[in-house]
Amino acid sequence: MKLINIGFGNMVVSSRIVAIISPDSAPIKRFLSDAKTRNELIDATYGRKTRAVLVLDSGHIVLSALHPETIAARIEGGDKEEESS
């Protein structure tokens, strides 16, 4: 079980992440609104601007203040560390 830091000390299990997307498009905003009404939205931005939306295999949506590229690099970096050890 590999935990990935998504900002401000918040962690997500990397194997549970299905997608990391940018929140800027209208369909994603509707998707977030629907998740909020279903109580499946987790806001880990601490009041900062949402820069990445993480979709988990459980159907939950996690908002992060980090860029999608940063989170993806942390996941990739973690995989490389596991391979080398």
UniProtKB/Swiss-Prot annotation:
InterPro entries: RemA-like (IPR007169)
Residue ranges of the TM segments: none
Pfam families found in the cross-reference section: RemA-like (PF04025)
Stored PANTHER family: REGULATORY PROTEIN SSL2874-RELATED (PTHR38449:SF1), REGULATORY PROTEIN TM_1690-RELATED (PTHR38449)
Family the entry assigns: Belongs to the RemA family.
Protein name: Putative regulatory protein Dtur_1444
Lineage: Bacteria, Pseudomonadati, Dictyoglomota, Dictyoglomia, Dictyoglomales
